[in-house]
Each structure stands twice: as structure tokens, then as C-alpha cells.
From Swiss-Prot:
GO biological process: mycothiol biosynthetic process
Family: Belongs to the MshB deacetylase family.
Cofactor detail note: Binds 1 zinc ion per subunit.
MF (Gene Ontology): N-acetylglucosaminylinositol deacetylase activity; zinc ion binding
PANTHER family associated with the record: 1D-MYO-INOSITOL 2-ACETAMIDO-2-DEOXY-ALPHA-D-GLUCOPYRANOSIDE DEACETYLASE, N-ACETYLGLUCOSAMINYL-PHOSPHATIDYLINOSITOL DE-N-ACETYLASE-RELATED
Known function: Catalyzes the deacetylation of 1D-myo-inositol 2-acetamido-2-deoxy-alpha-D-glucopyranoside (GlcNAc-Ins) in the mycothiol biosynthesis pathway.
Catalytic activity, EC: 3.5.1.103
Lineage of origin: Bacteria, Bacillati, Actinomycetota, Actinomycetes, Mycobacteriales
Pfam annotation, one family: PIG-L
Main enzyme class: hydrolase
Chain segments annotated as transmembrane: none
Protein name: 1D-myo-inositol 2-acetamido-2-deoxy-alpha-D-glucopyranoside deacetylase
Catalyzed reactions per annotation: 1D-myo-inositol 2-acetamido-2-deoxy-alpha-D-glucopyranoside + H2O = 1D-myo-inositol 2-amino-2-deoxy-alpha-D-glucopyranoside + acetate
């Protein structure tokens, strides 16, 4: 299984439980991250001077440590933890920041990479690792981040190249939030909003209609490890005292889900009951 993400913390927020579950099942799980997340907004004062804009520009290196800690938390206790893996090597491409930010003008920003280069690097990884399942973002980049959208596009292009030479079908999934799961989580969260946090406004958190979701993975057994992994990304994520919600630097309440949701998008996807195992149908 290969999970393709843009920045450290995306892997845990979107797919942390799924990573932990399949590691528990003995699957060879690799987490590939495109950038170091140099443009992340730091929570609190302790590490605030690591930022790029007006600071030491050391946040990316620090976040490698956070990602390492998060993957260790997601890994089965007593075993060898999953190690971070960066496209082109750590630091090859840089976090582009949000749309319209000055960070997008940096010469190493991911959005300035010639499209063929990251596609070629990812194609080589797909050919050498030969995953049976690939997980990434939807075409909107989950919430519109330019790097997330580019990761989606690069992944789709690399998969298309591999399909031309590899007869085995790769199951491809986009990680999404199910609408009813989000609403249920927010109803529960409204009873325990931490001081200084706020509930999201209507439509502020993206979600998909339930009918579009094709796979639902039960990660309740791995839930505590997912929470620990979120806490490992301390510059970016605050976990509520209840352990049931988290917030980014904007202090907007977001539920921590015990089920993670996906939409299958490869050519062999067919309508039918929701999958409960992403390896269904793989011999």
C-alpha cells in the first residue's frame, strides 16, 4: 500500500487509522510525502521562530521529526516503525503555501516543479515498489491547497504511465470525509468545545455525500494510536482534552473519526456495496 501526501500531518489527519490498521495486518505500507511542510502555520510560541517568513526557515526539518514521531505512533508496538519517505528525497520540493501566497514564488516550490519531473520520480517508485493499493487526494485537493491538487494530478499521471506497462490492476482511492460522519462528529463536539476554539460554519469543512463514498475502513481499534500521531504534529495540530477532536492553527473544531472514508477511482471500480477492506478482490 502506498499513501501519497503533500505535507507532514496530512497522512495522519486523512489516513492515520488506515495506515495503522494495515500495518497491524502485516501489509507493507509506505507513506510518501512531497514536501517538508515549510509553510505550515505554527501553533503557539515555542517553535514560532522556525517559520520561513521572518523566522529561521527551519520548520521543514523540524517537521521531519514530527512526521517520524507520528509514523512511529501509528506503527504496531514493539515492531520497527514506518519511516518517512519523501518524493525525490527530503527537501527536493518545497511547500508552496496557500493559493496566492508569496511562498509560491520560491524556486523550489512544488507548484514550480516541471510537471514531468515529479511524475517521473513517482512513476519510478510505483514501478519499483509495485503497490496493490494507492491512496491520495481528490481533484480539489481536499480543501483547495495548491500542493494537494498537484499531488492528485501527479499521482494520476504517474499511475497512467504505469498502467501502460503493468498488467496488474492497481486499486486507487481518494481519501474523503463522509458528510454524515462529519455532521455526527460535529454534533457530539458541540457539547465540549475547548476554550478559544470555535465550531465550523456551514460548509466550512469539506465533505462528500454519503452515496459517493465507496469504502469505509473501521479504525476504532487503532483510534488511540491515531490520536497519538496527531499529537506528534504539535506545531500544526492541537488535540482536544477529550481526545475526540482536534484543531489546526485556526482553532476550528474537527472530529477525529473512528472510520475513514474513500472513493475508488481506478478504471476497474464498479458500483456496489461499500468496501470494508481496501484489498478486497486482490488475490
Amino acid at each position: 500500500m502506498l499513501l501519497v501526501h503533500a505535507h507532514p500531518d496530512d497522512e495522519t489527519i486523512m489516513t492515520g487509522g488506515t495506515i495503522a490498521r494495515y500495518l497491524d495486518e502485516g501489509v507493507d505500507v509506505r507513506v510518501l510525502t512531497f514536501t517538508l511542510g515549510e509553510e505550515g502555520e505554527v501553533i503557539g510560541d515555542r517553535w514560532a521562530q522556525l517559520v520561513a517568513d521572518g523566522g529561521a526557515d527551519q520548520l521543514g526539518g523540524f517537521r521531519i521529526g514530527e512526521l517520524t514521531g507520528a509514523l512511529a505512533a501509528l506503527s504496531p508496538p514493539g515492531g520497527s516503525p514506518v519511516q518517512p519517505w519523501f518524493l525525490g528525497g527530503a527537501g527536493r520540493w518545497r511547500d508552496s503555501g496557500m493559493a496566492g501566497s508569496a511562498a509560491a514564488r520560491h524556486p523550489r516550490a512544488l507548484v514550480n516543479a516541471g510537471f514531468d519531473e515529479p511524475v517521473g520520480v513517482l512513476t519510478d517508485i510505483l514501478e519499483s515498489f509495485a503497490p496493490q493499493v494507492v491512496i491520495t487526494y481528490d481533484s480539489a485537493g481536499t480543501y483547495g491547497h495548491p500542493d494537494h491538487k498537484l499531488v492528485h494530478e501527479v499521482t494520476a499521471a504517474a499511475l497512467a504511465r504505469v498502467a501502460a506497462s503493468r498488467p496488474e490492476q492497481i486499486k486507487v482511492y481518494e481519501s474523503v470525509t463522509e458528510h454524515s460522519a462529519l455532521q455526527a462528529g460535529l454534533v457530539a463536539a458541540a457539547r465540549r468545545v475547548p476554550d478559544g476554539w470555535r465550531m465550523p460554519g456551514p460548509g466550512e469543512l469539506p465533505s462528500y455525500p454519503d452515496a459517493m463514498v465507496t469504502a469505509e475502513i473501521d479504525v476504532r481499534t487503532q483510534y488511540d494510536r491515531k490520536v497519538a500521531a496527531l499529537a506528534a504534529h504539535a506545531t500544526q495540530v492541537t488535540v482536544a482534552p477529550s481526545g475526540t477532536e482536534y484543531a489546526l492553527s485556526n482553532n476550528i473544531v474537527q472530529p477525529i473519526f473512528g472510520h475513514e472514508h474513500f472513493i475508488r477511482v481506478d478504471a476497474a471500480a464498479v458500483a456496489g456495496p461499500r468496501e470494508t477492506d481496501l484489498f478486497d478482490g486482490i488475490g
